[in-house]
């Protein structure tokens, strides 16, 4: 992470953290940085499962002038999901209360990686990882049972919140097919 500075946001497996200490690379030696992780973050993410040396997905925030190569990802993890099928046809089980925000051909973030949903399921979703994504992220080596951080598309949450004000009980209703509407 060239150019990282004190106070910068950096996503670790999709979880936005703030750099609180750092040292740049010197004479070929690797640089490093540190972040504080709150109890709240540990309780809502899989960061507590990491051991020293575990590979992680690292990403710096996009600047407003940069090209957006996926969807808007905040680094605010909604839940931890569980891998039920490995790449390339990755399947993830998640809290059914969040599946209403997952739609076929929509976006989902898995461990910080913006992905397109192939299949929306009652208890999760599937995505198809292209070889490049599998090679340059940790998703290509994830195994069945591994925990992953999930962030649903924030736009869907905002739309639901805005529409809820116009619904009789302020909540989405169940459609006959069992999907939220």
Where do the language-model regions lie?
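Conserved loop->alpha-helix
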Residues: 1-181
